[in-house]
Amino acid sequence: MGADLSGQDLQEVQISYCNLDQANLADAKLIQASIQHTTLNNANLHGADFTNSDTYNISFNHADLTDAIFTGSLLQRASFDGANITGADFSSTLIQPVRQRLKLCDVASGVNPTTGVVTRDSLGCW
């Protein structure tokens, strides 16, 4: 198992070149965080709040992102292969490359219990 940072207030934290694979960040507050060149593969991010965060080259592969909030975030070169995004809110989030957003639309479902936003709607899925 990875680090246990569940429920932690990590607002405005700066994380670079970290391996947080299998970490528990459930319900962590990562509001306005800057996260770069970091892996969160197989991590528990259930209910984590990434509002207005700036990420670059980050991997969420096979992570649990259920009910996570990414509102207003910038997700550049983010990878979500096999991630569970049920109930996640991506409203006003810039996801690059665009093909990543399209891949997320293929698996998007649910409604975020905090914001009340439908995941597919927040991604702009057709």
Map each language-model feature to its residues.
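Tandem repeat scaffolds
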Residues: 1-126
